[in-house]
Design a protein with these regions (language model features):
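Residues on the lipid-exposed face of transmembrane beta-strands in outer-membrane beta-barrel proteins
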Residues: 6-10, 115-121, 187-191, 245, ...
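Outer-membrane beta-barrel strand-turn architecture
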Residues: 11-14, 123-126, 183, 191-195, ...
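Flexible glycine-rich, low-complexity coil/linker segments exposed to the extracellular/periplasmic environment
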Residues: 1, 43-102, 160-172, 229-240, ...
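Transmembrane beta-strands of outer-membrane beta-barrel pores
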Residues: 12-14, 21-29, 136-144, 203-209, ...
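C-terminal beta-signal and adjacent terminal beta-strands/loops
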Residues: 41-44, 277, 441-449, 470-519
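Gram-negative outer-membrane beta-barrel transporters
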Residues: 273-275, 285, 291-450, 487
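Outer-membrane beta-barrel signature, preferentially recognizing the C-terminal barrel domain
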Residues: 100, 104, 108-110, 178, ...
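Repeated loop/turn-to-beta-strand initiation elements of outer-membrane beta-barrel proteins
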Residues: 15-17, 126-130, 196-199, 264-267, ...
């Protein structure tokens, strides 16, 4: 990041006029490479074939003692990838972790020029004290997305339902430029309408720029999960960025009333409304990418299926792969085991195979939404005792939710991360000792609309108790002790219904002892 900024101010009796200019340049580079060696099939079929100590049995269910894990797949193995890889390299005669070139080299350049003007005033209006902060900011942004990518040479069929994207040595540069500008006004006004009661009004227009991942000019492909000749339900997928994305724009309105019934005690109520446009949604397009071809749906796959039918052999992923490999290499179908076919042969696409139709998901600015709610808060200290209490509750509503009863094949846009929250804090602050214990709660919320393709993911309602105690030994030296989630609460995530478990998080309690010294 390279940044230059110049600010100025003209001071008056009732306030000031502030102004400035800014230039900011940012560059983000992402490098990615993949080395893959397929050793055996899914899971561990014959762990005894590996050197002693390479694998350790793992009871997965026992790792989640706070949950009912009945019916959960419980037995697994864990081990050292480096140790197993080194053994396999020596056993089968290949180099472990070959030095492949970077398959993807992506750079995003963002150049921002801004100028602002601000008026800061304080005074009285009909005997009521007020504060006014009003201004406007203009920003111009130029975006350049550069991708230097290794072109895929083909998708190899390495086993029944095992596929691997292989890359050639050719690299290709893709560069896309875009630009946008915004005028961003802002107004904050508060006035003491009666003694100890303050009314606040705020309006602003803000932006949130797309993430760099969404601005990539390159596409990433993922092979299908099985032979497409056997079913129409299996598809290959791809994802790509969109360098022409523009920021989210939000018109924000906030109203609140605060009543101070003591020097450190108050109650407040507020309303907020945010009108947001240019939300990023995913658009799915059926298209071929990089000229890649489907080895599982061409003449060789058709001939293998016909041969299996003629012999009366059940047709599935494994038998089809074995027959294609046998016919292509001139060996008998029954001469090798399934494992030997997988270990000895890969089937590569050729010009007679059909082009793969990928379902390419790319981000686009295509949605708008409204977010609104209320905020209630209160704080009170009990005389000079040092004891106090703070409580707040925030409601969040949105006009676009996820329809769990909709057709799963339809991509839905919905606002994520919206839920009511509440906090209750008991405090002690006197002399050199400060202590707080807090109860924090968050209601159930939608956290993703694409947990798997078009499936939603919900985080269930959750609460935890935290505490913090600190003591000022001197003005400069402070010791502290804190505990987070001291009652050992856990997080559970599910899909369209609570029965569709996605994820369990056993968080546990965390404690920290700290020392801080100010120089």
């Amino acid at each position: 990041i390279t940044q230059a900024r110049l600010d100025g101010s003209y001071v008056m009796d009732t306030g000031s006029i502030n102004f400035g200019i800014e230039s900011r340049s940012m560059e983000s580079t992402s490098l990615q490479s993949l080395t893959r060696h397929t050793m055996g099939n899914w899971g561990i079929e014959n762990p005894g074939e590996l050197p002693a100590g390479s694998l350790t049995p793992l009871d997965l269910a026992s790792e989640f003692s706070d949950f009912n894990t009945e019916g959960m797949f419980s037995q697994g193995f864990t081990g050292s990838v480096a140790q197993i890889g080194a053994f396999a390299a020596q056993e089968y005669g290949f180099d472990f972790l070959a030095n492949n070139p970077f398959a993807t080299n992506r750079t995003i350049e963002e150049d921002i020029t801004a100028v602002y003007f601000e008026l800061d005033l304080s005074g009285e209006l009909n005997g009521m004290e007020y504060n006014l902060l009003a201004g406007v900011r203009y920003e111009n942004t130029d975006v350049t997305s550069i991708a230097n990518i290794s072109l895929p040479s083909g998708i190899a069929w390495e086993g029944n339902n095992d596929f691997n994207v292989r890359f050639g040595s050719d690299m290709e540069d893709v560069e896309v430029e875009s630009s946008y500008d915004h005028v961003l006004p802002a107004l904050d006004f508060d006035i003491e309408v009666v003694e100890n009661m303050i009314a606040r009004f705020s309006y602003s227009k803000t932006i949130a720029r797309p993430t760099y991942n969404n601005l990539s000019a390159a596409a990433t492909v993922s092979p299908q999960s099985g032979p497409t000749i056997l079913t129409d339900s299996i598809t290959a997928t791809a994802s790509s960025g969109n360098p022409s994305l523009i920021p989210l724009e939000s018109d924000n309105l906030d109203l609140s009333f605060e009543y101070y019934f003591d020097e450190t005690s108050y109650v407040s109520v507020g309303f907020y409304d945010k009108r947001v446009k240019n939300f990023i949604g995913n658009e799915q397009v059926e298209e071929n990418i990089f000229g890649l071809r489907d080895v599982t749906n061409g003449p060789r796959a058709e001939a293998a299926r016909a041969e299996l039918e003629a012999r009366g052999i059940p047709i599935n992923d494994t038998s089809l792969f074995n027959m294609v490999a046998a016919m292509e290499n001139g060996i008998e179908y029954d001469s090798l085991t399934d494992e030997q076919f997988e270990q000895q042969f890969d089937v590569l696409p050729n010009s007679e195979d059909p082009l793969i139709t990928f379902i390419n998901s790319k981000p686009v600015n295509n949605k708008a939404a409204n977010i609104y709610g209320f905020e209630l808060a209160a704080q009170h200290f009990f005389g000079d005792s040092g004891f106090g209490v703070l409580a707040n509750y925030t409601t969040v509503q949105g006009d676009i939710g996820f329809d769990n009863d909709a057709n799963p094949s339809i991509t839905q846009f919905a606002l994520v991360g919206l839920s009511d929250t509440a906090n209750l804090i008991l405090m002690y602050e006197k002399d050199a000792l400060q202590a707080r214990i807090a109860y924090n709660w968050r209601d159930k919320f939608l956290d993703t609309t694409s947990q798997y393709i078009n499936e939603p993911g919900y985080t269930e309602d959750y609460s935890q108790i935290d505490f913090n105690v600190s003591y000022d030994i001197t003005e400069d030296l402070t010791v502290s002790f804190e505990g987070i989630n001291i009652t050992d609460e856990n997080i559970r995530r599910h899909g369209r219904t609570s029965a569709m478990l996605w994820k369990l998080d056993e968080l546990g309690a965390r404690y920290a002892l700290g020392v801080r010294y100010k120089f």
